[in-house]
Structure formats: C-alpha cells, structure tokens
C-alpha cells in the first residue's frame, strides 16, 4: 500500500513537470529523486537571434508515514541566460538567473494530495489540453495568477477512477502599511477549481475550470480526443482580467500526429481583450525523438496580427507595432533527465 501511494505521488509530480526522474535514494520508506531538462532554444524574429536556452532541475522527496499516509516535498528551479555579448553576467537579473518554479510540501494518501507553498493552481491541467507544442502555442488561454504557479497557496489534487480534480486557495500576502505601524494585505487572495473526466475507453476527455482573484475571474472549458496516433483538442475561456476595460475571451485549437519517432503538432490561438484582438496566431512544429529523453525540434509561429491593427489591452487598447506583428522561428534540442 505504501509503495502504491508513493508511486502515485511520483507520477503526479512527473506529469506536472515533464521529467524522467533518477532515483538518488530509497530505503525504509524514504525516497529522493532528481529530474529536469537541458534545453537549447534559438529564437529568430525579423532575422535577429535570441538565446532562450534554459535548464530545469528538480528534487522530489517522499516519506511513507503509515499504510495510508505519506509526506511529500518538491522543488524545481529554472536557470536561464541573457548575457547579450557579456561574460557570466545576466543583463536583466544582475547575474542571478535562477527562478523557483515550485517549492512545496504536503501530505497525501488514497484520498489525494494536499500541499502548501509555491505550486500550480487548478487551471494548468485545463490549458494542457492544447499546450502541446515544443515551443509555441498557449497564447489565448491566459490564466490568473491564482490559477497558475503561485506562492502562499494551498493546493489539493485527487484522482478517482476516471475523474481527476484540483483545487487551490491563495492567501493574500501580509505587508506593512505606509506608516509602518500595522499589517495589512495586498488583496491578491483567490481560488481556482477544475475537473477532468475521461469518458471510459473512448479516447474522449472533458475538462472545466474556474478561477477568481481580487477583481478578476475566468472560466475554461476543454475537450480532447485521442485516436491512435492522432490527437485533437480545444479550449474556450471567458472572464474579466480587471474590473474595468478587462473583458477577456479566447479559444485554442490543437492537433498532433505521431509518425514513428516524429511528432507533428499545430495550434491556432485567438483572443480578445477589451473588445479588440489581443492574440491571433497559427503555429506548426515537428519534434524528432532520437531517444525517449532526447529530441530536436523546429517550430514556426505565423502571427496573424498586422502592424497598425488595434490591439486589445487591459485598461486601454493600443496599436500593434511592427514588433507585435512579427513571426517567429524556433530551433531546439532538449535532453530530459
């Protein structure tokens, strides 16, 4: 029973981070695993190159407490570079280029897993329906911070046969008032909920989610269908990013086809913010898997917004610049460990 519960925890963490973990220690109910990725990413816009390479490293620890309960702790960081011709110096981050993506601990069992710290909100599993590309995509189903990765958050997830559920609540952050005499909060509390149901063995999955934070809210509906080597999915989202001039509506469509060691994917993304287009693009990519944990890919995003178009923005619309209208080519190599 203990091994089964811990295996569920490991599997859930692996799905959330896309890792192939290596076991560092496993004895007397205590286990520690390390995983991550090294990814070289070259971005080209208007003939100009940018290095978007990154390294992700994570550690997952589990401790069997009894036959029905385990403890879990997880951390993941991302290292990036932005030296722009310098040597060992990041121009934007004062040479500190480590971001913490996850940092949480909690308890789990057959009833699910409860954690506190920096973890995912409930809408990430919904956007995953169409967020399938190696580089591009996922530009129309925006998530509120409380529904994305955020700190100071309690999270729950559970799997019950064909139904998976997630819920999160983020506390408002404590801060001193301007006079420094008493504590108040920043008003960034909120919650998110989601559920995904797999319809028997049909290949059909349905998902729905909702999030609310401060004066913003959103809901999402998603569906996917898998048939052999083919995959199709779609998402619709609607809500308010702000109390005024913040109406938001978006949808994404995605498809994938696996041919031997090559996976072809494509997505279309369209969104409106404040009644004007804020995203409109079509992307295609191809990934070749030399081995299950090593791939190369090429990805191209066709930006369907033209320079001079009205561009939707929260708080007031703008006009699309030449940079806003550029296509993008990305080339990458990714090693998972």
UniProtKB/Swiss-Prot annotation:
An example Gene Ontology molecular-function term: porin activity
Location in the cell: Cell outer membrane
Protein name (record): Outer membrane protein U
Keyword Transport among record annotations: yes
Signal peptide: 1-21
Keywords: Cell outer membrane, Ion transport, Membrane, Porin, Signal, Transmembrane, Transmembrane beta strand, Transport
Function: Forms pores that allow passive diffusion of small molecules across the outer membrane.
Subunit note: Homotrimer.
Similarity comment: family membership: Belongs to the Gram-negative porin family.
Gene3D superfamilies: Porin
Ribonucleoprotein among keywords: no
Pfam family, one: Porin_4
Principal localisation: membrane
Species in which this protein is naturally found: Vibrio parahaemolyticus serotype O3:K6 (strain RIMD 2210633)
Annotated membrane topology: Multi-pass membrane protein
GO cellular component, one term: cell outer membrane
GO biological process terms on file: monoatomic ion transport
């Amino acid at each position: 029973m203990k091994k089964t519960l811990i295996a569920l925890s490991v599997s859930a963490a692996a799905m959330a981070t896309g890792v192939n973990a290596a076991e560092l220690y496993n004895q007397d109910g205590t286990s520690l695993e390390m995983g991550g990725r090294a990814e070289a990413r070259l971005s080209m816009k208007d003939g100009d190159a940018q290095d978007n390479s990154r390294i992700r490293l994570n550690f997952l620890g589990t401790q069997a407490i009894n036959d029905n309960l385990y403890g879990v702790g997880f951390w993941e960081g991302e290292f990036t570079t932005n030296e722009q011709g310098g040597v060992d110096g990041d121009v934007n981050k004062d040479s500190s280029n480590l971001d913490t993506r996850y940092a949480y601990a909690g308890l789990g069992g057959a009833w699910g897993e409860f954690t506190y710290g920096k973890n995912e909100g409930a809408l990430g599993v919904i956007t995953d329906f169409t967020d399938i590309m190696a580089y591009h995509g996922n530009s129309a189903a925006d998530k509120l911070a409380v529904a994305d990765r955020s700190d100071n958050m309690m999270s729950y997830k559970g799997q019950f046969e064909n139904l998976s559920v997630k819920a999160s609540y983020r506390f408002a952050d404590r801060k001193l008032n301007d006079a420094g005499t008493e504590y108040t909060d920043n008003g960034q509390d909120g919650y998110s909920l989601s559920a995904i149901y797999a319809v028997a063995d049909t290949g059909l999955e349905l998902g729905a989610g909702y999030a609310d934070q401060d004066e913003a809210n959103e809901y999402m509906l998603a569906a996917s269908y898998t048939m052999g080597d083919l995959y199709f999915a779609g998402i619709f989202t609607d809500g308010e990013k702000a109390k005024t001039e913040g109406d938001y509506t978006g949808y994404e469509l995605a498809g994938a086809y696996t041919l031997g060691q090559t996976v072809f994917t494509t997505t279309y993304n369209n969104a409106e913010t404040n009644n004007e287009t804020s995203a409109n693009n079509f992307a295609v990519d191809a990934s070749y898997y030399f081995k299950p944990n090593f791939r190369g890919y090429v990805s191209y995003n066709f930006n369907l917004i033209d320079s001079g178009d009205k561009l939707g923005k929260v708080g007031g619309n703008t006009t699309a610049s030449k940079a806003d209208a550029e296509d993008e080519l990305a080339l990458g190599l990714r090693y998972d460990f």
